[in-house]
A protein has these predicted regions:
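Residue-level signal for inorganic ion chemistry
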Residues: 13, 35, 121
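Active-site catalytic microenvironments for nucleophilic, acid-base chemistry
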Residues: 18-22, 38-45
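Gly/Ser/Thr-rich beta-alpha loop segments that engage phosphate groups in nucleotides
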Residues: 14, 18, 30, 124
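C-terminal charged capping/lid subdomain of soluble metabolic enzymes
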Residues: 48, 52, 56-142
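Active-site metal-coordination segments of metallo-dependent hydrolases
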Residues: 5, 23-31, 55-59
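An active-site-proximal "capping" alpha-helix that borders the catalytic cofactor pocket
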Residues: 28-42, 65-71
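Oxyanion-binding "anion nests"
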Residues: 1-24
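Residue-level detector of well-ordered alpha-helical segments, enriched
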Residues: 4-7, 11, 31-34, 61, ...
């Protein structure tokens, strides 16, 4: 797996690879879904930690990124990915399959995954995210 600054290139890939494996989407399209999901995870963490200002800031940045991806006709949500998947499945089954695929990720470290978390344009941190937290987010994300 990548180490050091190369890890920043994993932004969008942790969830994106799970989406790619399950949906059959092209790599870039799946990473677009993962990128938007990563912004959502950061926003959720900020708000659950009581930092609504940080949540609002990251949501504004996510809207900018979302607008660019939408202009490129890329899928933006897990539901978008499910609807374009090569095999029809229920929303819950699709999300559980994505979670299962994510647990095989090379960035997994026991009960955590090293995750590239966007903090703003050009600002990404690498942090461990618990698999349970990640699974909970995937189950509830748009």
């Amino acid at each position: 797996y990548e180490q050091g600054p190369r890890m920043l290139l994993n932004l969008g890939h942790s969830i994106g690879h799970g989406v790619e494996v399950i949906s059959g989407l092209a790599h870039g399209a799946a990473v677009a879904v993962g990128l938007i999901a990563a912004f959502g995870l950061v926003s959720r963490r900020a708000r659950s930690g009581g930092d609504s200002a940080a949540g609002t800031s990251i949501e504004r940045t996510a809207e900018r990124v979302r607008a660019v991806l939408k202009a490129l006709s890329l899928p933006l949500t897990l539901e978008d990915a499910r609807l374009t998947a090569s095999a029809a499945t229920s929303p819950a089954a699709f999300r559980e399959a994505v979670i299962e695929a994510m647990t095989a990720d090379k960035k997994r470290r026991g009960a955590d995954m090293l995750f590239a978390l966007p903090r703003g344009i050009g600002n990404v941190t690498i942090e461990p995210v618990g698999l349970e937290e990640l699974a909970g987010y995937v189950r509830e994300a748009p």
